[in-house]
UniProtKB/Swiss-Prot annotation:
Keywords annotated in UniProt: Kinase, Transferase
SUPFAM superfamilies in UniProt: P-loop containing nucleoside triphosphate hydrolases
CDD domains assigned: dNK (cd01673)
GO molecular function, a single term: deoxynucleoside kinase activity
Name of the featured protein: Putative deoxynucleoside kinase
Species in which this protein is naturally found: Frog virus 3 (isolate Goorha) (FV-3)
Coiled-coil portions: none
The keyword Kinase is annotated on this UniProt entry: yes
First-tier enzyme category under EC: transferase
Cross-referenced InterPro entries: DCK/DGK, Deoxyribonucleoside_kinase, DNK_dom, P-loop_NTPase
Documented EC number(s): 2.7.1.-
Amino acid sequence: MSIPTVIAFSGNIGAGKSTLLRGLEAAGYEVVPEDFSRWGQLFEMALEDPNRWKFSSQLKIMLIQSEIQRAAKKSDNRVVVLERTTECVLDFCNVAMEQGQILPAEHDMLVQIWEKVNVPVDAKIFLNTPPEKCMERIAFRGRAFERDIPVEYLSSLHSKFTRDPDYIMSGLESKEVVLANAIELIEKIVSRNVR
């Protein structure tokens, strides 16, 4: 049994990750999208009262993402494509601390937990879409819990996500071009990662 190549796409809210992952799944890749339903009530509570619940919700999301990354390493498929990583959760935590939604001590604790539970992926690809374009896409898809996101929040996240990806792809082209570019990049990564 060979070990799969685990590749994660990160990017801002509204960057085009979910659309891209649906295309990759249709192309035959094993895909694990974000599943908001697994985050449960804590996620909803954090949206309503972030100063009270942001730490707890981010901890839960980090633990779930760690489980996803661990399971991906055990897949029988040649490639597993994930939506986000535990590092992305830390990026959300960094912004939450900057906005006063979690305390520095809570942030330090999340980093310590991340150091214990993180399961590294083989490649992180950042889907680079400017915050203003993300705002347009967020408005178009109409998710209730996203309707009040300010562009400043997206700009803060964007600056965090751009810090340490292995690869950067533009999210501005048509979904067909983004998909073709992603498949080409995935296959290049897999060919370098044959075990």
